[in-house]
Design a protein with these regions (language model features):
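A short, surface-exposed loop/turn module that caps and links secondary-structure elements
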Residues: 35-62
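A structural signal for well-ordered alpha-helical scaffolds and beta->alpha junctions
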Residues: 23-27, 42
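Enriched for short, Lys/Arg-rich terminal
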Residues: 1, 9-12, 19-24, 59-68, ...
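Short, intrinsically disordered/low-complexity patches at protein termini
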Residues: 29, 50, 93-94
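Generic recognition of well-ordered alpha-helical segments
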Residues: 12, 29-32
């Protein structure tokens, strides 16, 4: 099992998502899947982000159609690092 580590920015963005009515149960469900390294269901549309120096090994998935989780698995140290969460426009200014 991977230890879950939340980036400071993630914590702030997650509080904002909850205030907007996003479900903590949905976040907990996907964190359980990721931390236990289970197969991620297709509905989450998990994919790698552009592989630049800043985003090396960073992935994104859709908790809901416009609620995203950006994360990185650091298997050598057994960590699931939650980097960002929010809408497309929150995260990518779209």
């Amino acid at each position: 099992m991977l230890e879950i580590v939340f980036a400071g920015k993630f914590k702030k963005e997650y509080k904002r998502a909850l205030k907007r009515g996003c479900s903590s149960a949905k976040m907990e469900e996907i964190l359980d899947i990721l931390s236990h390294e289970k197969t991620i269901p297709e509905k989450y549309k998990d994919h790698a982000l552009i592989n630049t120096h800043e985003l090396k090994n960073v992935r994104e998935l859709h908790i809901e159609p416009d609620w995203l989780l950006i994360y990185r698995k650091e298997k050598q140290v057994q960590i699931l690092r939650c980097l960002r969460t929010g809408t497309h426009s929150d995260l990518f200014n779209k």
